[in-house]
């Protein structure tokens, strides 16, 4: 599943190709995504993109009369292509521009989304309850510790709660907890403030490194120009169950938490 770094890489990749460019056509091949694609997305026709933003794992293309929201779901990719590029299986949506290029959404599992937000109320209804961005100043020392008080849930589950902080998905939660030396099963409320502050800094470092390396390509994700991301080569625990720990050579273990894979080193990580 594309996580925050992959969506940010996508934002950085598409922005130079679409900002200030006028939409000439909207092509919908399959409306049946996570939510049906509304006809209102055609409101973008004739308008230039003012800017491209990201909130959590949502891409937001800003226009003068509204916002086109895109979500990659479990398996989606968005690519910048020439308009005459042949249509492939699972190519559900094109945003066509006058300058000859298109944004194309490919989504085999159809858990992605394409929506039109006509006003601030629409946006608030979808995004208002999200936690802070992990790379923002709002995600600072003391924040995680204050949020974790009396929370008996495992720390990994806590980190992946979008109401606590957005965008720390399974891959990067595994990696951050390993680097912080914290077991994914440790209760959030039992982690002291010093370790929580260290974890905060490590989350920022891991996510920033992933963005710099173009994200993590495991199966579905590619960058906006079709190239893979290279952070997979830097993964220390995710996807390495049964292999030797990069630090102490202990065999990495794997468990299931909330139907997700958690990989950890029983020697380097503590409650």
UniProtKB/Swiss-Prot annotation:
Q: Which SMART domains match?
A: Fapy_DNA_glyco (SM00898), H2TH (SM01232)
- Read off the Pfam families from this record: Fapy_DNA_glyco, H2TH, zf-FPG_IleRS
Q: Which GO terms describe its molecular function?
A: 8-oxo-7,8-dihydroguanine DNA N-glycosylase activity; class I DNA-(apurinic or apyrimidinic site) endonuclease activity; damaged DNA binding; zinc ion binding
The record's section on Gene3D superfamilies has:
1.10.8.50, MutM-like, N-terminal
**CDD domains per the record?**
EcFpg-like_N (cd08966)
Residue numbers annotated as active site = 2-3, 57, 260
**Swiss-Prot/TrEMBL catalytic activity:** Hydrolysis of DNA containing ring-opened 7-methylguanine residues, releasing 2,6-diamino-4-hydroxy-5-(N-methyl)formamidopyrimidine; 2'-deoxyribonucleotide-(2'-deoxyribose 5'-phosphate)-2'-deoxyribonucleotide-DNA = a 3'-end 2'-deoxyribonucleotide-(2,3-dehydro-2,3-deoxyribose 5'-phosphate)-DNA + a 5'-end 5'-phospho-2'-deoxyribonucleoside-DNA + H(+)
| Cofactor needs | Zn(2+)
The note on cofactor binding and number reads: Binds 1 zinc ion per subunit.
List the FPG-type ZnF regions, as residue ranges: 236-270
Keyword vocabulary terms for this entry: DNA damage, DNA repair, DNA-binding, Glycosidase, Hydrolase, Lyase, Metal-binding, Multifunctional enzyme, Zinc, Zinc-finger
EC assignment: the record states 3.2.2.23, 4.2.99.18
> What positions does the entry give for DNA binding?
90, 109, 151
**Biological processes per GO annotation:** base-excision repair
Q: Which PROSITE patterns match?
A: FPG_CAT (PS51068), ZF_FPG_1 (PS01242), ZF_FPG_2 (PS51066)
Role of this protein: Involved in base excision repair of DNA damaged by oxidation or by mutagenic agents. Acts as a DNA glycosylase that recognizes and removes damaged bases. Has a preference for oxidized purines, such as 7,8-dihydro-8-oxoguanine (8-oxoG). Has AP (apurinic/apyrimidinic) lyase activity and introduces nicks in the DNA strand. Cleaves the DNA backbone by beta-delta elimination to generate a single-strand break at the site of the removed base with both 3'- and 5'-phosphates.
HAMAP family per the UniProt record, alphabetical: Fapy_DNA_glycosyl
The record's comment on protein family reads: Belongs to the FPG family.
Subunit (UniProt): Monomer.
Q: What is this protein called?
A: Formamidopyrimidine-DNA glycosylase
Source organism of the structure: Colwellia psychrerythraea (strain 34H / ATCC BAA-681)
What gene is behind this protein? mutM
